[in-house]
Amino acid sequence: MCNKIKEYWEKFCCENKIPNDTKYEAWSFGNTKEMADELADLVNKGIKTATTGAYELYDEDEEIPKVGEYNIILDGSGEPICITITRDVYIINYNLISSDHAFREGEGDRSYEYWKKVHDKFFSEEYRKSNKEFKEDAPMVCELFEKIY
């Protein structure tokens, strides 16, 4: 793991009296540098407080997020931008995701229509890369989080 990320985590732990060995994940959003930069900025500004992942595209040994987990959000260059804590996680079919969840994702005009348009494109591409077909009723992992640092 990058020393910058480790140092960022240790600084957070020291300032918040959290043991350094507390588990965390460091990751970026999306599938391009530009998307990672844009979405990390939305999280850092407190606008983006939710995300959606395709359950069927998780690696076999990859766990879904858990309530109480810490995440270091990285930009498109792998630089730490902020830290979040997971507040809720649920699995729901893509076509049943609510306008409230879409709003919390913080993207575009925050409407469900905008969210669906960009996520249809994103998930279609991600499924295609995995040689799978994206379907409207695909199970999705919805995560709500709070920026804490």
Predicted feature locations:
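Mixed-charge, low-complexity intrinsically disordered regions
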Residues: 1-83, 89-149
